[in-house]
From Swiss-Prot:
Homology family: Belongs to the bacterial ribosomal protein bL9 family.
HAMAP family referenced in this protein's UniProt entry, alphabetically: Ribosomal_bL9
Keyword Ribonucleoprotein belongs to the record: yes
Name of this chain's protein: Large ribosomal subunit protein bL9
Length: 149
């Protein structure tokens, strides 16, 4: 019997795959557990529509990420911090502070986990901070740390 897997089944198939399995296995296990449905023409058409919808969403997310990349690369985030002699900061600037400053200054909401700051910023001046917007799209955000008076 041909079935469409709704979830990954170890040793049998992955989600969205169409496979031939034994009738008893399909009826007594896969269907009852909600792991698969029968591969009827209507179900195949629904699966195809679902795949197309997912592809459209993925393409839209990629386009949005590229658009956001262009915006971010034009911006500079200004952060004022207390500093000592030689431009060393008291404390440091973290990805959370960068995300909050970006929201406050430019109205762009960005998750702090997307800001890939290896080490916190501990000096005054300009720093280029990598931002991972999408698995395929990365941007560079300029952060300008100034001395707080």
């Amino acid at each position: 019997m041909k079935v469409i897997f709704l979830k990954d089944v170890k040793g049998k198939g992955k989600k969205g795959e169409i496979k031939n399995v034994a009738d008893g296995y399909a009826n007594n296990f896969l269907f009852k557990q909600g792991l698969a449905i029968e591969a009827t023409p209507a179900n195949l058409k629904a699966l195809e529509a679902q795949k197309q919808k997912e592809q459209r969403q993925a393409a839209e997310e990629l386009a949005n990420a590229k658009k956001l990349k262009e915006q971010l690369e034009k911006l500079t985030v200004e952060i004022a911090a207390k500093a000592g002699e030689g431009g060393r900061l008291f404390g440091s600037i973290t990805s959370k502070q960068i995300a909050e400053a970006l929201q406050a200054q430019h109205g762009l909401k960005l998750d702090k986990r997307k800001i890939e700051l290896n080490d916190a910023i501990r000096a005054l001046g300009y720093t280029n901070v990598p931002v991972k917007l999408h698995p395929e799209v990365s941007a560079t955000l300029k952060v300008h740390v100034t001395e707080q008076k």
